[in-house]
């Protein structure tokens, strides 16, 4: 799988597949939805400003009740990334500046993996207790694909 980022441009609104995934994860991890679609730029100092993946309708922020549950959610997303078509996961509370997992990293010869963030290169919310994740475009538009993927994860 390749990382899409914002190549698909801004969406016109919420996308049904991402909303289905967010609702399922909220249920599984007793978590709060902190937001999905919003038309905005990334929260960084990039010049010129860069579109947020939230604006594509493929990114979500979610916060379980405890740090341990957030860690379980992050592990679940990364462990099942191929099946769930997860392209990126942000762990803001890891280390000083957080870390990001991506389905394909240049520095890892295109393989999936974690990158520890620095003061200059980070996800913009160091120390935050929530998780950010991004899904592939084909899943963002298909609650049916999302439901089938969760069934596969749980062996049903």
Locate the predicted segments by residue.
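Secreted/periplasmic proteins that engage bacterial cell-wall peptidoglycan
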Residues: 1-104, 119, 128-135
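Low-complexity, Gly/Ser/Thr/Pro-rich intrinsically disordered linker/tail segments
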Residues: 8, 135-156
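Intrinsically disordered, low-complexity coil segments
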Residues: 95-96, 108-112, 124
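Mixed-charge, low-complexity intrinsically disordered segments
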Residues: 101-115
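Short proline/glycine-enriched turn/loop segments at secondary-structure junctions
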Residues: 116-124
